[in-house]
């Protein structure tokens, strides 16, 4: 009997404690989405039980009808108060104008896991700044044009041959997009950053894919690791999460150790030169520094880039008029040449519009966050926009997926309409309502390369094939609740029909 009373007392005490915690925004007069006072998970319940994707969760928080016209909305990451920023000007304040008050991302790796803690996305400001400056030299427009493009053309040619082999003597065939797009993007990544002639499209398999997919295998430990890194950063020293699996970390270390192309100027070479130019006690001298950056570059581009290419093909298949207009533009571009130059590819207007619209519906980053690092003891004031001071340590989230599908800024937001980015309508796009790769100093380092890769892949598919929906094509995209990235929960199938330009 005593045990029952103690249990009841504990439950009631916990409930009162949670009520107090969850009263944070109400007591300050800030619009908020109150979680159940019986749940210690805050607003993360569906995510923690793998019922909703990261992107969909933050979109729901952003678009909740209870928010009305609120510029910021409070919610809870377990018991930690967090902000959802919904106003474009405040988004600009957080990501760009007042970057010095929001220097870090909220997530954090365990310091005892250097393979995770040293990576560009998880490194804290001073380490991040140096690493970013080093790695950004690989992504200049000049290098993309003069060095990368020819290598990417080779992979794009392999993509054409891959489809030719899949169809054989047939005029059309229904194919899944996932494997093809993954082979394409990992072949590009291996060639550009590790000087590896991966050849996944030629062989139909890739060790890079095998190793990377292991990171997405869902098990209780992996779920705990991801949730710890993203939502319990202060507990990582206790929970000891691993960003990479041991097998993946070992593979990346071997890849770096076996790298023997000092003249290539690839990612590994660039990072090794960075190490040589720093003192012996510099953070970059850690044995895992190069492997950690190599590992995160592959991971960041693997699912994001391949899924985006699949989504773009899916939308083109559902909109034959848009696909025909794009193919007409490509047909004209290919009249006098068998291969498009970098400059020609980058100046095709309708191709650009199609890719921009694909990135609106399926942004490379579904959400971003920044942790308030204001040196002022009370925090950073959002006045005159909102009467609220963001305290040091509080995370501010931006749902890019929510922003890009907000009917306040995008009429018929779920309709695939490249004309939004045409000469007439693009002038009316509200600043900071289109940020598919994030924005500001922490914006995606590989954004331009990602767009180039998408354009090249789409061009070399449509050059030889017409794509259309079939009986196996999903009627709508549902995002995988077991993936951190935006990827389809179900495989996307399309019919590929031989139709040279």
From Swiss-Prot:
Binding residue positions for heme: 444
GO BP terms: ecdysone biosynthetic process; insecticide catabolic process; regulation of developmental growth; response to DDT
Localization per record: Endoplasmic reticulum membrane; Microsome membrane
Protein topology in the membrane: Peripheral membrane protein
GO cellular component, one term: endoplasmic reticulum membrane
Keywords noted in UniProt: Endoplasmic reticulum, Heme, Iron, Membrane, Metal-binding, Microsome, Monooxygenase, Oxidoreductase
Recorded coiled-coil stretches: none
Main location class: endoplasmic reticulum
Entry similarity comment: Belongs to the cytochrome P450 family.
Protein name: Probable cytochrome P450 6t3
Organism for this UniProt entry: Drosophila melanogaster
Gene: Cyp6t3
